[in-house]
């Protein structure tokens, strides 16, 4: 497997482009033939209208031709939101001469504001004309940005019996990131030219989302609009049964890299952190403990301040609900070059005036840090990704709708 250019347009038979002016943008991804579709969505009880619409579409049909997404308005908690989401479907279907039910819809932006459909129609028409002229995955990625500071895209390919399979993706997200998608707003659209059935694609996607997007945190909020779509059009000529493990690894890589990009672009973020909890008695314990650490506001602010306050880490594990014996735990801090034990076998090492504390303080100056907690209770492990919480985060969100 190798990384290539092209994002969602790298796989055969996919076109994409986007247009944004001011706060309002639209991206469209289109497949030249029917593509098997799968998706996962927010578990927030307040659900945006495009999520309701697309969730039903995914539930009731197997194949799709297009994805349309707008930025600047979440189309959530509004009187005419469902009609507006369906109008987006209709506009795209009419331009590309496909059925309305073949169009999946997503939105991101401010909650509770009515969509200005004149703006949406203008943007959709502009993107249609751009797609006729050429492909631009990066333009599509830029069009769905809200508080993001940079577009997020990636693509990979691998060989199977002389044929090439490609997987590409774009994503957006910088705030309201603590996805929990069983079936900033976090949007991710993935394309692939592998041939695969809906059941297999759905199962693989859920497994991958659990390992990636459901393990990231910027601010601990779960959006009303979180969505991941995958379209697979089969144009590589390679069936999933020929390369199951390779395809899963490719999809996992794409989603993990996009998840990391989202975290690194977290609103006001200055530092990236990887949290590994290992030695847990159960998988559930590993997940609980790692998420408690990565979501802890006290841990996030300590990371921002460069403070190796390991007490906040063990406190988070303690309230996580995971089975945990403080008398045996290890806590290790690293910057991927140097590492230091903050706690070993339940004994604090990074105490006032120690070499361990000095080393920890140097490590905390790095832009990327890794926290490893070994519970020594079993064999299970989970990895989460997060970022610090800065003054800038407060400013961005205090001024979001103004």
From Swiss-Prot:
Active-site residue list: 185
Keyword list, A-Z: Acyltransferase, Amino-acid biosynthesis, Arginine biosynthesis, Autocatalytic cleavage, Cytoplasm, Transferase
Keyword Amino-acid biosynthesis part of the UniProt annotation: yes
Gene3D superfamilies recorded: arginine biosynthesis bifunctional protein suprefamily (3.30.2330.10), ArgJ beta chain, C-terminal domain (3.10.20.340), L-amino peptidase D-ALA esterase/amidase (3.60.70.12)
Top EC class of this enzyme: transferase
Activity regulation: Competitively inhibited by L-ornithine.
Subcellular location field: Cytoplasm
Site (Involved in the stabilization of negative charge on the oxyanion by the formation of the oxyanion hole): 108-109
GO BP, sorted A to Z: L-arginine biosynthetic process; ornithine biosynthetic process
UniProt xrefs under InterPro entries: Arg_biosynth_ArgJ, ArgJ-like_dom_sf, ArgJ_beta_C
Positions annotated to bind substrate: 146, 172, 185, 267, 397, 402
Temperature dependence: Optimum temperature is above 95 degrees Celsius.
UniProt superkingdom: Archaea
Residues the record marks as site: Cleavage: 184-185
Assembly information from the UniProt record: Heterotetramer of two alpha and two beta chains.
Assigned protein family: Belongs to the ArgJ family.
Stated name of the protein: Glutamate N-acetyltransferase
Gene (name only): argJ
């Amino acid at each position: 497997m190798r990384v290539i250019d092209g994002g969602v347009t790298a796989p055969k038979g996919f076109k994409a482009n986007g247009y944004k002016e001011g706060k309002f943008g639209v991206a469209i991804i289109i497949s030249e033939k029917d593509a098997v579709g799968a998706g996962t969505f927010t578990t927030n009880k307040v659900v945006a209208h495009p999520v309701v619409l697309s969730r039903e579409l995914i539930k009731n049909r197997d194949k799709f031709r297009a994805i349309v997404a707008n930025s600047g308005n979440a189309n959530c908690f509004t009187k005419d939101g469902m009609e507006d989401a369906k109008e987006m479907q209709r506009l795209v279907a009419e331009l590309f001469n496909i059925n309305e039910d073949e169009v999946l819809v997503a939105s991101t932006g401010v909650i509770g504001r009515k969509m200005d459909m004149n703006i949406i129609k203008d943007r959709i028409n502009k993107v249609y004309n751009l797609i006729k002229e050429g492909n631009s995955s990066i333009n599509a990625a830029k069009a769905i940005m809200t508080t993001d500071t940079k577009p997020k895209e990636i693509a990979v390919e691998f060989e199977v019996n002389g044929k090439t399979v490609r997987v590409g993706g774009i994503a957006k997200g910088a705030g309201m990131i603590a996805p929990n998608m069983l079936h900033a707003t976090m949007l991710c659209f993935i394309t692939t030219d592998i041939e695969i059935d809906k059941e297999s694609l759905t199962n693989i996607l859920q497994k991958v989302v659990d390992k990636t997007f459901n393990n990231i945190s910027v601010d601990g909020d779960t959006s009303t609009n979180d969505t991941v779509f995958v379209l697979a059009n089969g144009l590589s000529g390679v069936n999933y049964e020929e390369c199951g493990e390779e395809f899963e690894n490719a999809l996992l890589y794409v989603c993990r890299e996009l998840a990391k990009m989202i975290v690194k672009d977290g609103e006001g973020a200055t530092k990236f952190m990887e949290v590994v909890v290992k030695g847990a008695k159960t998988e559930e314990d590993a997940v609980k403990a790692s998420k408690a650490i990565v979501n802890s506001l006290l841990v996030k602010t300590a990371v921002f301040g460069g403070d190796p306050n390991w007490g906040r880490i063990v406190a988070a594990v303690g309230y996580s609900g995971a089975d945990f014996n403080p008398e045996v735990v290890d806590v290790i801090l690293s910057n991927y070059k140097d590492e230091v034990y903050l706690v070993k076998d339940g004994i604090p090492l990074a105490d006032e005036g120690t070499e361990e504390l000095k080393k920890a303080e140097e490590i905390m100056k790095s832009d990327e840090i890794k926290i490893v907690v070994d519970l020594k209770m079993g064999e299970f492990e989970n990895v989460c990704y997060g970022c610090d919480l800065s003054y800038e985060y407060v400013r961005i969100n205090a001024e979001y709708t103004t």
